[in-house]
């Protein structure tokens, strides 16, 4: 990262599932703690895959988190001694998350968000594209395609081992039982003629 003389900015960590987004968010939070900065981590209540009160990476790293139902609930937990606000699975938050993140950065907090930039269909997911547009720093991570070994920028949803259809519900919380990382060429979404 670059030397920043002003307090308050936004960092977005994005990519497909299994690309290391939560792991990178945890790493950045731990670095702030080593620097004696005060950090707080948030996650949406819907994300209960591994834990209800921790952000947990697929490889088992974890950090304590405050689960919240709505974006604006984040404000209730912020205190003046905080330096860093981290938010995992940001794609699951409501539309107010962009305003919340902007307000926090404008108040002088370093705001780190992590989330999927594309849904299982390969389309922009939730508010992540807007957050990427207003962020000072964007880190786009890639996984390894489970079909061919190429860099994977997409998330393949599987239902009984087969690709999910384009019109299936967007949100289905899951892990390796429901999703695989895929490259552009090995990603399939039935009924979508562009894929």
Curated annotation (Swiss-Prot):
Entry's localization field: Cytoplasm
Amino acids binding ATP: 15-22, 88-91
Keywords: ATP-binding, Cytoplasm, DNA synthesis, Kinase, Metal-binding, Nucleotide-binding, Transferase, Zinc
One Pfam family named in its UniProt record: TK
Keyword Metal-binding: yes
Gene Ontology CC terms, in alphabetical order: cytosol
One Gene Ontology biological process: DNA biosynthetic process
Record: residues binding Zn(2+): 145, 148, 183, 186
EC category: transferase
Main localization of the protein described in the UniProt heading: cytoplasm
EC number assigned by the record: 2.7.1.21
GO molecular function: ATP binding; metal ion binding; thymidine kinase activity
Catalytic function, reaction form: thymidine + ATP = dTMP + ADP + H(+)
InterPro entries: P-loop_NTPase, Thymidine_kinase
Subunit-structure text: Homotetramer.
Family: Belongs to the thymidine kinase family.
Protein's name in the database: Thymidine kinase
High-level lineage: Bacteria, Bacillati, Bacillota, Bacilli, Bacillales
